[in-house]
Amino acid sequence: KLRAQPAANDPGTDKTIKYSKIQSIIQKINSFTHENSLLANCRAVVELIDDLYRKLYSWFLHVLTFEDIQFPGDTFLDRLLKMDYCFTYYPSSNRHLIDLFEKTLDNQTFTNLDKFFDTSGNSPELLYQKTFSLKIFSKNLTAQDNGLYIYPLLKTDLSILDFLGTENILFHRGLIYHILHQKTIPQERENDLNKINQFFATVIQQVIETKSSCLPASLSQLLDTIFHFNRIGLNMETCRTYIEILSNHMATPDTQPIINTFTINLTHIVFTAHVFFICMENFSPTFIFYNRKKLILEQQRAILIIERNDYSTLWKQISDHIDCLFNVSLSESFFKEYTKGGNEDQKQFLYKNLFEKWGNVFFPFTYSVSTSNNSTAHHITTLELRDICKEVYQSDSPDAYESLLPYSTHPSFKTLYVKIYVIPMVSHITNLTFDKLQSDCRLLTLIHACKLLLPSQHLLLHYMAWLYAFSINVDHIDLGTFTVIKSVIFKIADHINVMTHTIYSPETNLLVSILLNAYTNYLQKYVNPWIKQTITANFSLIQTYITFTKQCASILATKCNINLDNLFIYITIGTDKIVTTSFCSFIATCRNLVRQHEEFEKSLQTIQISETTLTGMLRNIITSVSSSKELLTNEALQKFIDTVQRISQHVNETYQSISMNLEKCKTSNDILIESLKKIIYIVDVLSSNAILNTSLASRCLEAANLAVSNNSFTILEIKKDAVAVFKPFITQLFESMKPTTSLHKKLMSTQKLTTDHIPFLDTFDDRYNLVRHVERQLNWYAAHAEAAQQDLITPLKF
């Protein structure tokens, strides 16, 4: 909690002084709000209070420092991550971290930083901490990656948990990405993930769980919640990053339950924090925020549900919690105090004014209307009144409804007026498209008519006025807006049904046009950019993989012969010589092809992920649209659903075709890669590393077994015209692997030897080229291959 003020005899630390100042400011704001509570419906005062609270939120974020979120048990890496977090998102209050960050790195003597970093790859998860990695290597908290440097990146696998506190895991976005994209967790790391899940459960229970009594949170409690979220690495920006990561993640049936638990808990925490920060950014104890909150919740619900329809239950928990935290309303006791001394007409006006501004009825208001007894109204028949109402509706005059005022006290007037005038007008309005509604004046005419003739129907008038205000003020339609408008229109219909004791359903054209407009905006803002980015990335990946497959297929068509005199490889297709390369270059090429094959196996999984994500988006759109059952009879909506279904079917067919062709490529490539792995193993059996890691004797014995083993192979029959097709790929492949530094330059290098031991020299190095006619050399041993093998191996056998 935010600390209370220190005792009078306690000078206090910098922290306690800061917290006491925050508490003092909060108390002043609470006092100001309470003193002006009776003016809570005066727009001028409310706007000042609203602006004050929003400035307070901004100010509070700008006094947050690294020291506020530091735990006593933080590791060295924890402190570095938190310094980067505070300086990145709250730089104005954390300028002192520039020097502290550098000193922390300079003064560390017990931590080997090499353990933190990965030098083997460039996977998406590593890129989340790329700038942070540069900051560590440069010891500069202000460093920015401009693509000018190459440096190791912070590890993202579970081994980094050896250096990272469980409660600080959300400061490491790359690690979260890594865990989400795993199907199983190594057994030795399950305990670590269990601890993380327990920590998430604690956060949900202590920070997020809805209280038993849904009382609004105080300002101190709300600011304290901001503080707690920041202590675990969550703010508005990081929540958006995690939502993006989660939206691109799709669990599979074979995912380990412990990972599913992790995903569910993370989703609950991140989405709750995200909605909390949006509400907090707009919060004030006023009707302005009350109306904002309804729209915020509808917008976020629409976005969350369309991403994943299975989040419906989760959203109920999130919205209940947010409603509880930000429970701003009016009480009847406040209204009585507010209207003390006013007459009945004044109270009626103030009640109506409260209702119009808050958009809700928190308590009923009963009053009597005194009207002069109009003999004309009571002496006409119901049939005559029906004809009068019909004539007024059919009139071209916009003020024709005023002629009905003398009949408004007739016992049957309300029912007849609603049936003959209001219902046709509402049907006309809801049958318009949204564009036409903005230029049509009938809704405004209907509002004036009902205000004159049905003054006691506050809710009906409010919803009509809300619909009109929306039609003239909205500049952007989204799914949250559609949900609110749909609710308003059907509430108008419900009030009509109550007044007429009938079942009335509005037309669907207006809602469908708004819905299609909202989905069009959604597709343009979220789906289209994602598709464009994904297609570009996938297309580039597939093109590269096709080139790789062509190289593999070209090598499959070749025959390689080794010249033992100079260790050169002659590569041929049939009788045509294609290329000549050194043995070292040949082996390096083999290793490179095997490495590329393994990298492609990982990177091609992104295509499967993108398929799952895109089809999920389209499926959720269809499900979400179809959930509006009242609109399904609309022809335009049916066409939209059919279009999305056709797109979804086309996407499935396209991805299936891609998957089939990629599988064929993989099958072809696997044949070559298995052969290359055997070649590499034969070469590596006597390599420096193999001898160093085992022993010379064991390696020689293994080499002897390989020498006598029978490795048969089949030469493919290649058509003559295929040579021209394969040759460019083979030539390009081996040309790129030619060494750029000569052996002489390597030997003459002035660089000092930095290894701790004398290395076993590579037996295939150029310095070990076989000497021709070795038997002519003085004192050299010369024998046939079989005899030499026996002489070498016999002493090693035991």
Curated annotation (Swiss-Prot):
The keyword Protein biosynthesis does not apply. GO terms for cellular component: viral tegument. GO terms for biological process: virion assembly. It holds the Pfam family Herpes_U30. It is found in: Virion tegument. Disulfide bonds: none annotated. Keywords: Virion, Virion tegument. Belongs to the herpesviridae HHV-1 UL37 family. This is Capsid assembly protein UL37 homolog. It comes from Human herpesvirus 6A (strain GS) (HHV-6 variant A). The gene is U30.
